[in-house]
């Protein structure tokens, strides 16, 4: 459960002495007239600011447009917005994590070019004829078009919270060798454990070439919606970094966050210190319903990729004396168990419009397909509610053609061949 916090709207009840919670989803208010308009990602991050734009009509994913800029005063961090017919995706890249190219620039240890960065995070574009757009009027077109299309792909952070933990500073320090069986069972239930190396489906901005984001993650698909989870306990862990900056960089970009809470005390909706986070889905196992689990899950060594570094003793309760393989999380969703139940509470920033489906009363679910489908639908509904009034209309053909029209228009003018 969430505690009351100014600036947030809670679904599933608050813990300020209420014995019954009130579902404040109002179907009649779930329309565009009452939705507060939120600035698009492009307008927030790129419009009117120093950046570069590249495009191509012929990539493996069809027409593609990429906006890229340096982050702050550093020349080592880059922020990208990748736009295709399928949707819009934010990607953050660091110079040290980029694929090393055998060029004069790399030998001289010069900073990578924008094209180096793009082809490193999107290797499939290496042989694509990307052109740089020099006509600044494209910004006016893109500010109307570049609004995330959430109904096809979603990336969501997934954090594990222990009994004594209260915010992301604590949760980002958790490692997979020191989590509960209930948490591992939930990962098993939520989706498929996939190897990131050369992963061909939606990767959610995770590194699929150099394992800089770990070796595995959790992926799921329902109908035509793909979901990639940024699972904090599966990301590399650096004992020398108390803030776990690399984990934070990735997760801080996610608008939708799932927290699996093993604790019994209420959590504050502002437990995630990121302006990007708009929706938090808090899932708490009801342990009275948990039977003896027969699922066997090993210990992941994803977070121990850095040679010579081991988890801090303060973060572990057991000592592993033998080398173990990655968790045996089933590659396919297991047969649901009715012995486990979950209580769900959802925190939304006040500016997030209402969205469905509403939580049931009481907000308790059995571990079954209905609960899994509810989570997917809630993430899709929440992510879609974050959109500004988009240039994309409700028809799928018009959604795709909006971006194609911009790329086609500027492919004949204001272009600089790379």
UniProtKB/Swiss-Prot annotation:
PROSITE patterns, alphabetized: RAPGAP (PS50085)
A Pfam entry, by short name: Rap_GAP
Residue ranges of every copy of the Rap-GAP domain listed in the record: 142-407
Biased composition (Low complexity): 311-338
SUPFAM superfamilies membership: Rap/Ran-GAP
An annotated GO BP: actin filament organization
Taxonomic path: Eukaryota, Amoebozoa, Evosea, Eumycetozoa, Dictyostelia
Domain of life, source organism: Eukaryota
Purpose: Mediates the deactivation of rap1 during multicellular development and is required for normal morphogenesis. Also required for the correct patterning of specific subtypes of prestalk cells.
Cysteines joined through disulfide linkages: none
Name the record gives this protein: RapA guanosine triphosphatase-activating protein B
Native species: Dictyostelium discoideum
Gene3D superfamilies reported for this sequence: Rap/Ran-GAP (3.40.50.11210)
Region (Disordered): 304-339
PANTHER family on file: RAP GTPASE-ACTIVATING PROTEIN, RAPA GUANOSINE TRIPHOSPHATASE-ACTIVATING PROTEIN B
Keywords: GTPase activation
